[in-house]
Amino acid sequence: MTSKPMTRRPTANNHRNRSPETAKKLGQLHPRNPHQGRYDFVALTHALPELAKHTITNPKGEPTINFSDSAAVRVLNQALLAHYYGVKFWDIPEGYLCPPIPGRADYIHYIADLLAQTTHVNKDNTPPTGKEIHALDIGTGASAIYPIVGSQSYGWRFTASDIDPISVNTAALICETNPKLKSAVKVKLQPEPKRIFANIIGRQDYFDVVVCNPPFHASLEEAMEANSRKQHNLQRHRGKNENEQISRSSTKSGNAAQNLNFGGQHKELWSEGGEIAFLTKMAKESQDFAEHVGWFTTLVSKSENVKPMQLLLKQLGVAQMRIIEMSQGQKSTRILAWRFNTDEE
């Protein structure tokens, strides 16, 4: 994506011929990410006719939706999943995160590059595909977005975990209801909220990669302040490329203000100590499962947390560590990846 609105969707050759490095410099999605440019409302409405009821016209005369309307955002996600990933049923409860799919997909495609460069499954360094690749999604949420994108883009198997029973039941229902997902994704409840890998990774398990989108706020108040800023930005940038918008489902329960298009249970949005505390716990616990995982990876939303995590991982004796930058319009984020074994071992 560019920071300016695009008037047409780029062709496959326009973006697939770019390198990931070029995409980052241009603020664009990964070249293999199908969610390039503006949303194709003709194709999306064909995949899910219900989207037409939520489609409006922006000041430029282009079709879009009201991203402050949680119902419209949910239907847009349903259309995207139906059109690009063949998912016929997808729904989440009120008040749970309705993730922006283009950005979530970028994580998976950059992870595919990491595996291509380090697993040596394919001699030409193309991303490995098929069920031989087993991925673990920590904190999958009710949406199960990473398992959906990863399994349908590359054919990988996924185990998806969460500490919230409603999220686990919802994600399991989505996977059980869609034949394409039923044999590809297994959803597990983490019975101990303070543990990450224990109870999920068994003695005989091996995962090629772990993915994680951790809660990054330290309190509900901090999360609500961030949401208010995002809502303000939604109003300021209305009419820009929709893929830069933050998709959130509204909440009607809990302690959050009901007039905010908030989205997300407390377990999804914040944890004690915030992002750095969660990442620290994840890194320390990863030591105990070094022989069971190829690459541990996680998103790091706050750039100031990168250096402390690098220092900690060095202290823990990791063999390899990588920072993978991602850029989506004017938003930048990164993946922190580490492992305890080298390519040769």
Curated annotation (Swiss-Prot):
The keyword Transferase applies. It is found in: Cytoplasm. It catalyses: adenosine(1618) in 23S rRNA + S-adenosyl-L-methionine = N(6)-methyladenosine(1618) in 23S rRNA + S-adenosyl-L-homocysteine + H(+). It is an enzyme of class 2 (transferase). Residues 1-35, 225-258 are annotated as: Disordered. One of its GO terms (molecular function) is nucleic acid binding. Residues 229-239 have a biased composition (Basic residues). The keyword Signal does not apply. GO terms for biological process: rRNA base methylation. Its EC number is 2.1.1.181. Residues 1-14, 246-258 have a biased composition (Polar residues). One of its GO terms (cellular component) is cytoplasm. Keywords: Cytoplasm, Methyltransferase, rRNA processing, S-adenosyl-L-methionine, Transferase. NCBIfam families: PRK11727.1. Specifically methylates the adenine in position 1618 of 23S rRNA. Belongs to the methyltransferase superfamily. METTL16/RlmF family. This is Ribosomal RNA large subunit methyltransferase F. It comes from Psychrobacter arcticus (strain DSM 17307 / VKM B-2377 / 273-4). The lineage of its organism: Bacteria, Pseudomonadati, Pseudomonadota, Gammaproteobacteria, Moraxellales. The gene is rlmF.
